[in-house]
Amino acid sequence: MGKYNFDEIIDRRGTSCNKWEYNVPEDVVPMWVADMDFAAAPEIREAMQKRLDHPVYGYTHHSKELKDAIVSWVGRRYHWDIQSEWLGFSPGVVPALVMSLLSLTTPGDRIVIMTPVYHPFYSSIEENGRVIINHQLDCDKNGYYSINFERLEAQIDNRCKAIMMCNPHNPVGRVFTGKELEELFAFAARHDIVVVADEIHSDLILEGEHIPAITLNEAARQRVILHHSASKTYNIPGLPVAFAIIPNEKLRHKYEEVAATMHAPFDTLSFDIRQRRGAGWKICGERRYL
């Protein structure tokens, strides 16, 4: 593994660690949350320490360097060019899902989720006065989950304003195909619905190909808010940074109005360092180890 030691056992107790200390008996190995026990890449730790040594932790802005790092990463990872002005920011993907719903919808509007799904999808809708449309994915005898578009068509009405999509899907493990995504966005276009896409696990696919929603076609690009974060990729969920890619100017301005008051002193640094210097930790180390 070279300089990255994924066999090191690290005791996280005594650090207010949710995974190990939040109502977890000492004789239980916790596997309930997507939070790995690998040490952060040394490049990230060194850069964070350098910033910590500066005595002022004030407000920060999302710099050109940060945006350039994201644009570069998306280009290298998915071979797709985005524009830096399409980017929006948040403290994490879950807050970003809420921000998207607040910017797109009003209380009483209906939102599609495809279940079983990551539990914050439920709370982000219900706790903000929106209504869930529960589309239960079909599951065949081999445990393969899929969208039933005929049934989905019958579930919605003109009060439905958004579809929340998790791709790769948590927890069923599906990576939706290009054909499925094209059908989903055609469905959204027919009903004038925006797709809010959580693609946070897309860097951790072991086999096959992840197709970002924004790469399908121009029509899909104008109907999606795509959320991503390096927190799962680099195992740094405690650092508050996520980004959205929003090509549609109207949707982006609405999102920015909700996001305008959110700042964190280390978000720009942590993402910039992860993408520029820590890529080997993920590409050559973590994923191969897993």
Predicted regions and their residues:
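PLP-dependent aminotransferase class I/II
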Residues: 62, 223-290
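Active-site phosphate-binding strand-loop segment of PLP-dependent enzymes
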Residues: 138-208
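A short helix-loop-beta submotif of the ANL/AMP-binding
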Residues: 127-133
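Conserved PLP-anchoring active-site segment centered on the Schiff-base-forming lysine
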Residues: 103-125
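Helix C-cap/helix->beta junction micro-motif
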Residues: 128, 190-191, 220
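N-terminal small-domain helix-loop-helix segment of the aminotransferase-like
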Residues: 2-92, 99
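Short acidic capping loops at alpha-helix termini that bridge into adjacent secondary structure
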Residues: 81-87, 107-110, 159, 221-224
